[in-house]
Amino acid sequence: MGVNVFDEKAVPLFARVMAELGEIQSSSGAERVVVPLAPVERTICRVRVHFVTPTELKGVERPDFGALLSRIRDRVSTLRALYGPGPLAMDFRAFGERASQVYMTRSDLDYVESSRVSKNTGQRHPLSGFTGIAEYEGELAEFVPFLETAHWTGVGRQTVWGKGELSVEEI
């Protein structure tokens, strides 16, 4: 189910979901969401990621787990640096190495060709990418909070145009 967060009817739903996702705090009159990124405290060995809208990961044709988590980690760190308490305090290389130990066990992905036309310049801009389902297996407890966060932030290129929406479920 897709939701346009700019649609007034979606605002109550979006506010409720964000409240459930993290603790909402007031900061200088603006609302702020705190999303816990600590590993979940149970064993998770398999997840299914549904790439809802066309997703493009720069330099990657298939969303292997290491590349996917690197892009999510970088987006979360950048958002924290710009709007939160600062970039993630973690060993990025070690995180990436652990993520690369998770393997894709199923891939049912399609490449979708799409584009938009700029109203200002008339130029056509590609919005293509893969959609579908990928399943991953491995030690996932550390990574599930990042995948859940990516549901809200998107992942990959051109998320501002609606690309990179994903959902995740434990299987």
Give the predicted meaning of each segment.
Residues M1-I171:
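RNA-interacting cores
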